[in-house]
Amino acid sequence: MKKFDISVLSVAPLRQGETMKQGIDSAVSLAKAVDNMGYKRIWFAEHHNHDAYASAATVSIVQHILANTKDIRVGSGGIMLPNHSPLIVAEQFGTLETLYPNRVDLALGRAPGTDQKTADVIRRSNHNGVFFFEREVNDILRFVGDKSVQGEVRAYPGIGTHVPVFVLGSSTDSAEIAAKLGLPYAFGAQFSPHSMEEALSIYRENFQPSSYLQEPYVIACINVIAAESIDEASFISASHLQVYIDIYTNNLSKLIPPTENFLESLSQFELEILHSRLGYTIMGDRETIRRELIDFQQMYHADELIVLSNIYELSKEIQSYEILKQVVDELFKKRMEQL
């Protein structure tokens, strides 16, 4: 098993009873904690028209997290490009890179990050933006590239910042685009596990080396709930599981406290949702996490794992990330001792 990095994905979720400000404060606390633990990056996802998330203005959240952390890379996971002008995105992230050099990531996605009615309000007349994703990614690459590749319209700040750009996806289409452009590819297996194997194969087999990247670079996003015991992990995972049920029953709400015997309380339909959508979810104690990480990596060989953990108590969420980091560090410590 090759060495891999680990990172964090967040939507700046609100717990039951929290205000938006409290949700953002919790996101800052999490970011500070994983920064101190040595995680590589933390990304924030763009979602709209949900009172359960505080990450709609993703650029503002990224800037706030950058200002409150020291070493960890911070970025979008991602900016939903059809909702935005490529020039404005380049200017925004060029500004962030100017203020926080070598700490900013720009991951780009094609989805709306919301329901269709909200997407209509955001995009107005730009309903075909999803079909121009590849072209608009290229536009951003140019805007943050060298002066020699610029056209008449330029991004200030932006030119020469070379903000690292990633392609997000949960389908084979996004894999093809990432491969063609020679960019790192982040696959959303946390909610769309079924096409990951095919998408990663397409990306790796069709990857074209570029000035940005010489070899394929795969980031796999998975769910991880870690605790000191299997029983505790099972208990605190109830909040995370409820999120996915809410998403796919169109009933999204704030994170709720976990309850005993959660799975036994679910309907057959709700159990089927979890079975179909949570294929890449690792829950358990240290040994379970270690074993399932090894199994996952032996199958997919990701260069990096970016982890989502929806846990009601912030202290338990931070502990989950701490356990995960310790497990991964121990894996590679033993690996080095065996060489």
Swiss-Prot record:
Pfam families: Bac_luciferase. One of its GO terms (cellular component) is cytosol. InterPro entries: Bact_Lucif_Oxidored (IPR050766), CmoO-like (IPR019949), Luciferase-like_dom (IPR011251), Luciferase-like_sf (IPR036661). SUPFAM superfamilies: Bacterial luciferase-like. One of its GO terms (molecular function) is oxidoreductase activity, acting on paired donors, with incorporation or reduction of molecular oxygen. To bacterial alkanal monooxygenase alpha and beta chains. This is Uncharacterized protein YddN. It comes from Bacillus subtilis (strain 168).
